[in-house]
UniProtKB/Swiss-Prot annotation:
InterPro entries: GlcNAc_MurG, Glyco_trans_28_C, GlycoTrans_28_N. This is UDP-N-acetylglucosamine--N-acetylmuramyl-(pentapeptide) pyrophosphoryl-undecaprenol N-acetylglucosamine transferase. GO terms for molecular function: UDP-N-acetyl-D-glucosamine:N-acetylmuramoyl-L-alanyl-D-glutamyl-meso-2,6-diaminopimelyl-D-alanyl-D-alanine-diphosphoundecaprenol 4-beta-N-acetylglucosaminlytransferase activity; undecaprenyldiphospho-muramoylpentapeptide beta-N-acetylglucosaminyltransferase activity. Keywords: Cell cycle, Cell division, Cell inner membrane, Cell membrane, Cell shape, Cell wall biogenesis/degradation, Glycosyltransferase, Membrane, Peptidoglycan synthesis, Transferase. It comes from Pelobacter propionicus (strain DSM 2379 / NBRC 103807 / OttBd1).
Length: 379
C-alpha cells in the first residue's frame, strides 16, 4: 500500500506525520510512504534526515495578507495543485493524509479530484483554516483534543491524540523525572526544607521554543541569567535557540558564567527530555503530546500570535488538571521567569507530581489508531 503524507512547515505539523509514517511502514515492509511539503518548511531538512522520500511543491498562505499577497498566494496554491495532480498520477497512492501546513491544501484538493481516499489530522484545540476547509470532504478527521470536535462533522471525526515518533515511544519504558529531581529528593533532609538550599544536586532545565526557536523565550532567559546565577541552585541548562539567536544567547551564558549547552536545533528530543527535570517551552500540540507521554513537568509559554490563540488553549487543557505550569508571554519578564524556575527547582515533589498528572493525560496509541483507520477502506 502507498501513502502520501502532506504538510509541514513546523515540527508541530510534521512530526505527527513522521510518527504515522513509522507506524505505517512497520505494518508491512512492502508499504511505501511519500512526504509532500515546501522548500521553506522544516520538512525540507527533517524528512530526508528521518530517512523518508520528499517531494516539494508550491504553496503559500493567504490569511492576513493584502490584496497582492493573496493573489500571489492563490497563484502558488494553484501551481501546487497542478504539481500535486502530477505526483498523484506518478506515485498512485492508496490514501493521502494531511497533517496541516500549506502543502496539505493543494495535495488534498488534488486527491479529492482524483478520488483518492483522504484524511486529515488536527493537532490543536482550535483548527487552522486549512483543516477547516479540508474537513468538508475528508473521509476521516483525526483530532488530538476533544475541544476541537465542535469544528468538525461528528460522524467522520475520531479522537486519536497526537501521534508520537518512535524516538519518543522508545523512551516510555524509562519515563520519570530527570536525574536532578531524583537526586534532590534523596538529599532533602525534611519535608519542609526547600531543596534549593541543599548543596549538591543539579536541576536540569530544557528550554526550547519549538523547532525554529522562540525569540521572546530566548531573550527572557538571557535577562534572567544574573538572577539564576545568584541563586543557590545548581542548574544544568540545555537551550535550543533556533539559528538566528544562537550566537547571542551562547555569548550571554558565557558572560553570566552559567553552564549551558546552546544548540540551534535538537534532532534527538527524546534524549533531551530524558535528561530534563523541567521543560520551558511553547505549547504546540506535538510538544504537549511528547512531554505528557514522558511524564515531564512543563512551564508553558504559549505563542501569543498562534492562529485563534490555540497554544494557550492547548496549555489550558493541561492547566485545568494541574498537569503543567503556564506563563503568558505578555507577563513574561526576567524576574517572573527566574522566580518560577527557582520555585520549581526548590520543590521536587511538586515537579514530580505535575509530571505524573501530565502522563495521566497522554494518549500513546494515536499512530496505531490512525493507521488502522487509513488501512480500513482498503481491507
Amino acid at each position: 500500500m502507498k501513502l502520501i503524507i502532506a504538510g509541514g512547515g513546523t515540527g508541530g505539523h510534521l512530526f505527527p506525520g513522521i510518527a504515522v509514517a513509522e507506524e505505517f511502514l512497520s505494518r508491512d515492509p512492502a508499504n511505501q510512504v511519500l512526504f509532500v511539503g515546501t522548500e521553506r518548511g522544516i520538512e525540507a531538512r527533517a524528512v530526508p534526515a528521518a530517512g523518508f522520500p520528499l517531494e516539494l511543491i508550491s504553496a503559500a498562505g493567504i490569511r492576513g495578507k493584502g490584496g497582492l499577497g493573496k493573489l500571489r498566494g492563490a497563484a502558488m496554491m494553484f501551481n501546487g495543485y497542478r504539481q500535486s495532480c502530477r505526483l498523484l498520477d506518478r506515485f498512485r497512492p492508496d490514501a493521502v493524509l494531511g497533517v496541516g501546513g500549506y502543502a496539505s491544501l493543494p495535495m488534498l484538493l488534488a486527491a479529492r479530484t482524483r478520488q483518492v481516499p483522504s484524511f486529515i489530522h488536527e493537532q490543536n484545540a482550535v483548527p487552522g483554516m486549512t483543516n477547516r476547509l479540508l474537513s468538508r470532504f475528508a473521509d476521516r478527521i483525526f483530532i488530538t483534543l476533544e475541544e476541537s470536535s465542535r469544528f468538525f462533522a461528528g460522524r467522520r471525526t475520531l479522537l486519536t491524540g497526537n501521534p508520537l515518533r518512535r524516538q519518543i515511544l522508545d523512551r516510555l519504558g524509562t519515563r520519570d523525572q530527570g536525574p536532578g529531581i531524583r537526586d534532590q529528593e534523596k538529599h532533602m533532609t525534611d519535608s519542609t526544607g526547600p531543596a534549593s538550599r541543599v548543596p549538591g544536586p543539579r536541576f536540569n532545565l530544557l528550554v526550547f521554543g519549538g523547532s525554529q526557536g522562540a525569540h521572546a523565550i530566548n531573550m527572557a532567559m538571557v535577562a534572567a541569567l544574573p538572577l539564576l546565577k545568584r541563586a543557590s541552585v545548581r542548574l544544568g541548562i540545555t537551550h535550543q535557540t533556533g539559528e538566528s539567536d544562537r550566537e547571542r544567547v551562547a555569548a550571554a551564558y558565557r558572560s553570566a558564567g552559567v553552564e549551558a549547552r546552546v544548540l540551534p536545533f535538537i534532532a534527538d528530543m527524546a534524549s533531551e527530555y530524558a535528561r530534563a527535570d523541567l521543560v520551558v517551552c511553547r505549547a504546540g500540540a506535538t510538544t504537549i503530546a511528547e512531554v505528557t507521554a514522558l511524564a515531564k513537568a512543563c512551564l508553558f509559554i504559549p505563542f501569543p500570535y498562534a492562529v485563534d490563540d490555540h497554544q494557550r488553549r492547548n496549555a489550558e487543557a493541561l492547566l485545568r488538571q494541574s498537569a503543567c505550569f503556564m506563563l503568558l508571554e505578555r507577563e513574561l519578564s526576567a524576574e517572573r521567569l527566574a522566580a518560577l524556575i527557582l520555585q520549581l527547582a526548590g520543590d521536587p515533589r511538586l515537579v514530580r507530581r505535575t509530571g505524573e498528572l501530565a502522563f495521566s493525560m497522554a494518549r500513546l496509541d494515536a499512530a496505531r489508531i490512525i493507521v488502522d483507520e487509513i488501512l480500513t477502506p482498503t481491507n
